[in-house]
């Protein structure tokens, strides 16, 4: 399968993983970090979900493109789901993991949000990596 189609499918999978993590797993205590709508207006989730979907598709495309370029340099040879997860985790560790851990040192009030970001991005990247590893040959 071509990398761009695999990237779009991985973006959709990442979107659903992200929706699950932020909608079902990380719900307690996150109200402190939300900007409330003006008084008397409901929360309009449509535009936010749309932006998240577009960003997830872009993320999937970038992940698939980078995976295709670097798949021969991975420890897991021959591609496959484990290679995709390895690639995703290798990208996650020096970027998102260290960033959220480092920010948690200074911004102690935001630590619950940073911990949620830490774990949700690990799940999101591994789901997308699994899909890309399965589909890109």
Set out the residue ranges of the language-model regions:
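Juxtamembrane/disordered regions of integral membrane proteins
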Residues: 1-137
